[in-house]
Amino acid sequence: MIGKEVTLQDIVLELTEPQTVDLHCEEELPEQDTEVEPERRAYKIILCCGGGCGTRLRLFVAATQFGIRGLQDLLLEEVVILCPDCRNSDLQHGGQ
């Protein structure tokens, strides 16, 4: 711009053809590997009834290494397994 007022000669337009991008190109995406499921192993858990009667209980599970450690933590701290006799005497039906 030369001077205080804008004139049409001061504006330079570069009119070029925009480059188009072929969105339907023939490029193929590689097949994604299917997520490998962690290996589950069978475990036999022998524990005493948590109701106090001392009955030995057997529990069979299939779990990952992480899962069996989590179950171990739950059984040692938060959850107890009951035998059928103790279950009948102390059963809560979800607040009923």
Swiss-Prot record:
Residue ranges, annotated region (E7 terminal domain): 1-37
Span(s) of short sequence motif LXCXE motif: 23-27
Record carries keyword Zinc: yes
Entry keyword annotation includes Transcription regulation: yes
InterPro entries given in the database record: Papilloma_E7
GO biological process: DNA-templated transcription; symbiont-mediated perturbation of host cell cycle G1/S transition checkpoint; symbiont-mediated suppression of host innate immune response; symbiont-mediated suppression of host type I interferon-mediated signaling pathway
Subcellular location: Host cytoplasm; Host nucleus
Keyword annotations of the record: Activator, DNA-binding, Early protein, G1/S host cell cycle checkpoint dysregulation by virus, Host cytoplasm, Host nucleus, Host-virus interaction, Inhibition of host innate immune response by virus, Inhibition of host interferon signaling pathway by virus, Interferon antiviral system evasion, Metal-binding, Modulation of host cell cycle by virus, Oncogene, Transcription, Transcription regulation, Viral immunoevasion, Zinc, Zinc-finger
One annotated GO molecular function: zinc ion binding
Positions of unnamed zinc fingers: 49-86
Gene3D superfamilies tied to this protein: 3.30.160.330
Modified how: Highly phosphorylated.
Motif Nuclear export signal per UniProt: ranges: 68-76
GO cellular component terms, A-Z: host cell cytoplasm; host cell nucleus
Top-level taxon: Viruses
Assembly and binders: Homodimer. Homooligomer. Interacts with host RB1; this interaction induces dissociation of RB1-E2F1 complex thereby disrupting RB1 activity. Interacts with host EP300; this interaction represses EP300 transcriptional activity. Interacts with protein E2; this interaction inhibits E7 oncogenic activity. Interacts with host TMEM173/STING; this interaction impairs the ability of TMEM173/STING to sense cytosolic DNA and promote the production of type I interferon (IFN-alpha and IFN-beta).
Record note on domains: The E7 terminal domain is an intrinsically disordered domain, whose flexibility and conformational transitions confer target adaptability to the oncoprotein. It allows adaptation to a variety of protein targets and exposes the PEST degradation sequence that regulates its turnover in the cell.
Similarity comment: Belongs to the papillomaviridae E7 protein family.
Function summary: Plays a role in viral genome replication by driving entry of quiescent cells into the cell cycle. Stimulation of progression from G1 to S phase allows the virus to efficiently use the cellular DNA replicating machinery to achieve viral genome replication. E7 protein has both transforming and trans-activating activities. Induces the disassembly of the E2F1 transcription factor from RB1, with subsequent transcriptional activation of E2F1-regulated S-phase genes. Interferes with host histone deacetylation mediated by HDAC1 and HDAC2, leading to transcription activation.
Protein name: Protein E7
